[in-house]
């Protein structure tokens, strides 16, 4: 499978990206290289390989839930640029 410059331009348009002509050629080449690599991977015989979700076995490593000293309110607010009493004041993000 080969990707054309027009297909890269179409995907860029969908993503609302603008590329110069040289960038378009670079991305077209890179996408085609990725697809060639994927074709090579598809040719590999994996019939005896068990499917995995991770390359190595993962085990949950939980720490014991212990009560311990935490950061005091004064220390946590010490570097706040504009604390409001005992709270962090942040810019409004929703109108």
From Swiss-Prot:
It is an enzyme of class 6 (ligase). Its EC number is 6.3.5.-. It catalyses: L-glutamyl-tRNA(Gln) + L-glutamine + ATP + H2O = L-glutaminyl-tRNA(Gln) + L-glutamate + ADP + phosphate + H(+); L-aspartyl-tRNA(Asn) + L-glutamine + ATP + H2O = L-asparaginyl-tRNA(Asn) + L-glutamate + ADP + phosphate + 2 H(+). Keywords: ATP-binding, Ligase, Nucleotide-binding, Protein biosynthesis. Disulfide bonds: none annotated. It holds the Pfam family GatC. It comes from the Bacteria. It comes from Syntrophus aciditrophicus (strain SB). This is Aspartyl/glutamyl-tRNA(Asn/Gln) amidotransferase subunit C. The keyword Protein biosynthesis applies. Allows the formation of correctly charged Asn-tRNA(Asn) or Gln-tRNA(Gln) through the transamidation of misacylated Asp-tRNA(Asn) or Glu-tRNA(Gln) in organisms which lack either or both of asparaginyl-tRNA or glutaminyl-tRNA synthetases. The reaction takes place in the presence of glutamine and ATP through an activated phospho-Asp-tRNA(Asn) or phospho-Glu-tRNA(Gln). GO terms for molecular function: asparaginyl-tRNA synthase (glutamine-hydrolyzing) activity; ATP binding; glutaminyl-tRNA synthase (glutamine-hydrolyzing) activity.
């Amino acid at each position: 499978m080969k990707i054309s410059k027009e297909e890269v331009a179409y995907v860029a348009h969908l993503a609302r990206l603008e590329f110069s002509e040289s960038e378009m050629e670079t991305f077209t080449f890179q996408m085609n290289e990725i697809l060639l690599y994927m074709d090579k991977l598809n040719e590999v015989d994996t019939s005896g390989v068990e499917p995995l979700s991770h390359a190595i076995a993962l085990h949950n490593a939980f720490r014991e839930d212990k009560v311990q000293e935490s950061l005091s309110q004064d220390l946590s607010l010490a570097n706040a640029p504009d604390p409001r009493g005992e709270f962090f004041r942040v810019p409004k993000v929703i109108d």
